[in-house]
Amino acid sequence: MTKSIYEFWISQGKDKLRLPVLPEQIDISNTIQNESVKVASFGEITFIDKPGAKEISFSSFFPKKHSPLAEYKGFPSPENAIAKIEKWVKSKKPVQFLITGTKINLTCSIEVFSYTEGQKDIGDRDYEIKLKEYKTASPRKIKQKKKTKKKRPSKSAPKTYTVKKGDTLWDLAGKFYGDSTKWRKIWKVNKKAMIKRSKRNIRQPGHWIFPGQKLKIPQ
């Protein structure tokens, strides 16, 4: 015989589980406020408008044999109840959490589920469960602005730099571009002149430059 107007249900599609023993208390929280609600005094639960995802946690037990605390007869064995919840966890799909007599009817993900040997009778299983409201993000339409063709700036004539003692293309790239790894830009436009000045630049590209040598510095 049902002892309370409140029934705790967890389901996934047509697969359902009614919890045999009501928890003494459930904790409901969101990013705006926290509250503890006694099962015996359930009433209308009001949340601040547009709260964050609600989190619900509680603990109870699955009885092995008929218990005076059980809400109904023919409840599943602890092993079957645990197997069902673990199957939902592994599916990585949301479940529906419903408490009759209240406005709690949420699509949730199972964040935590743990169980231990019961403290009351042999074969019972105490458990703790934490659920988090599952919210799907609705797609938003984004208006794309029409791209206007930007006029390409006219290429300016390459700058000329006179090599000083101790200069390297690596250092010059760092000086003009703020990035020494771009030394090949300078090498590319000066390749012929540098090889003509020293054939060693064939084997060691850009390595051989000399004081007084003029190099083009592309923009």
UniProtKB/Swiss-Prot annotation:
SUPFAM superfamilies: LysM domain (SSF54106)
Disordered: annotated segments: 139-160
Sequence ranges assigned to domain LysM in this UniProt record: 159-217
Biased amino acid composition, Basic residues: 139-154
InterPro entries with a match to the protein in the record: Bact_Kbp, LysM_dom, LysM_dom_sf
Disulphide bridges, residue numbers: none
Top-level division of the source organism's lineage: Bacteria
PANTHER family for this protein: PHAGE-LIKE ELEMENT PBSX PROTEIN XKDP, POTASSIUM BINDING PROTEIN KBP
The protein, known as: Uncharacterized protein YqbP
